[in-house]
From Swiss-Prot:
One cellular component term from this protein's GO annotations in UniProt: extracellular space
Protein name: Accessory gland protein 98AB
Recorded GO MF terms: hormone activity
Entry keyword Amino-acid biosynthesis: no
Domain of life: Eukaryota
Length: 25
């Protein structure tokens, strides 16, 4: 369960980073 939460957190961070990059660029 902990691994799943960690994976989701990493995915959310990556998604936010991509989203910010797209908005900036």
């Amino acid at each position: 369960m902990k691994l799943l939460i960690l994976f989701l957190a990493a995915l959310g961070a990556a998604s936010a980073r991509i989203r910010g990059h797209t908005i900036k660029g």
